[in-house]
Amino acid sequence: MGRVIRNQRKGAGSIFTSHTRLRQGAAKLRTLDYAERHGYIRGVVKQIVHDAGRGAPLAKVVFRDPYKYKLREEIFIANEGVHTGQFIYAGKKASLNVGNVLPLGSVPEGTIVSNVEEKPGDRGALARASGNYVIIIGHNPDENKTRVRLPSGAKKIISSDARGVIGVIAGGGRTDKPLLKAGRAFHKYKLKRNSWPKTRGVAMNPVDHPHGGGNHQHIGKASTISRGAVSGQKAGLIAARRTGLLRGSQKTQD
């Protein structure tokens, strides 16, 4: 009988430790308040910082509290073109400039926005990775809905009251540059999650993995495996509907 394979060990679980020691904090929009719903509020970018484990830089924006005599620092995901000392306007009546936060209903069609809320007040959920953005396709004022195109190409209908930041998330093209060295991959995943390095099953011995063994590296049997297989057999293409290359291109539905 073979050894317990990797996915069985993972499934057994362990004490979880999050890799968040060097992180700056949760990157969110301001809490939706009266000032943003009916007018605008002004903040200033104090600092642009690197966030460990994240591809995009963060901007620390200071707003004056609308109710108390104090300043509040918010952490935004920095957009391309945002700089320290820049004024950030957030609200329904804010101007259409890069870095400003507006409800989607106040933004013209064809505008590029990022860190968009899925539901009004959730403080940002869509298009948050480096170089990502959402395109406004159209508005339906009768139903107070806005149609957007997500970074995946999918179309989505969300409330026109959901907010977004004008512009593209900074750090675009980051993935075009190869890591080149194992050391860089080591440091990258040290701050993300315990998923590196990954040994291929065909590189193992037969005792360690269903694909292991042989005089040269090959799987040696069909890599599709049934959904009802026991856990030690579940390696490869589990319950695959189809395998092989996709023929032709798949268009996203309008």
From Swiss-Prot:
UniProt keyword Ribonucleoprotein, yes or no = yes
Biological processes per GO annotation: cytoplasmic translation
Keyword line: Ribonucleoprotein, Ribosomal protein, RNA-binding, rRNA-binding
Classify the source by domain of life.
Eukaryota
Entry GO terms, CC: cytosolic large ribosomal subunit
Q: Name one GO molecular function term.
A: rRNA binding
In the record, the note on similarity to other proteins reads: Belongs to the universal ribosomal protein uL2 family.
Q: What is the name listed in the Swiss-Prot or TrEMBL entry for this protein? A: Large ribosomal subunit protein uL2
Taxonomic source organism: Candida glabrata (strain ATCC 2001 / BCRC 20586 / JCM 3761 / NBRC 0622 / NRRL Y-65 / CBS 138)
